[in-house]
Amino acid sequence: MSDNSVVLRYGDGEYTYPVIDSTVGDKGFDIGKLRAQTGLVTLDSGYGNTAAYKSAITYLDGEQGILRYRGYPIEQLAERSTFLEVAYLLINGELPTVDELTVFKNDITQHTLLHEDVKNFYRGFPRDAHPMAMLSSVVSALSTFYQDSHNPFDEKQRNLSTIRLLAKLPTIAAYAYKKSIGHPFVYPRNDLGYVENFLRMTFSVPAQEYVPDPVVVSALDKLLILHADHEQNCSTSTVRLVGSSQANMFASISAGINALWGPLHGGANQSVLEMLEGIQANGGDVDSFIRKVKNKEEGVRLMGFGHRVYKSFDPRAKIIKAAAHDVLSALGKSDELLDIALKLEEHALSDDYFVSRNLYPNVDFYTGLIYRAMGFPTEMFTVLFALGRLPGWIAQWHEMIKEPGSRIGRPRQIYTGVVERDFVPVEAR
């Protein structure tokens, strides 16, 4: 067997499948003809060993703790770039020039308003509707307002939908928050930056204008960068799968938002905060909590540690930890939960039980503390995740649409049910 192929022996046959090279990281082999040649399909629950796509957008190495967008290390982008610049990079493949970035920002600024009729959707939602439910519903509803953008193969329509979504999602998210607390909606302002505008729409009230602290603006911008893409995760794969049916961008992104909502995906940072609050309620006894985790007492779990992909320290967690200190210091807050988090991290990183299981802090461990310090309730945490992940979803959707020979996603199954039986009338059952 050569390095360029994989041989499968089954029954009396021998079948060869070509190896697919990568520029860096995992290689694969193409099993496109497997079923036709052998009658077999592969079973890979959770897709832990299956590459559904070839992509040039994001690279991560879970063993080494590496994350790169279009080849740029996440550490450099978080330190030196801005969220909109990173969004341009992910979607277009290259960092923008000064003129390109100016045009990109101006285009987004001109599309931040929502159609006035969109307010009727919010008025129809129950008072206690979850912000993620409102977010996905309104994004899907944009398809009804922009029926000129339904053709995914029209480049002009794709680009316009991209600008509209990037511009309007902060407004949609802020309105979802306002609905949840019964406050009037605040219109966007064209003289403010992307993050400043979102914070103002979220926290301003008629009686008092919200003026965001520059440290808070910088920290949130950095958090959005760190969440902007993460290869083929659950929500991104959902966006691609829905988009493979040639659904428009609004419908595809709405599906991704719903996938992100799950507690195993975007909802993990809320679970971390609840865990820290539980330790606080127990007198801040970290040692007792660690013991319960190790002894598997009372179903206690260590949240915010470990990752499906990363087997070492999540590179994003290091950056977010520093941002947590900056935000709390700038806001003059002394947060007991941060102290508990630091103690918990110290204990876990020095305990062979956790180290041997590759349980290192992940991106969710500190984000909830930062969001909480900024004034966001826990129900908004996943909304903020979606706001950051939007450029990645859009970039992945574009890449999928433009892929030559792209086919609708249609997984196979291995059927384990009853083979066949005859129908029995209800009277005879």
Residue ranges and their predicted role:
Residues M1-R429:
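Non-transmembrane, aqueous-exposed alpha-helical and coiled segments at domain scale
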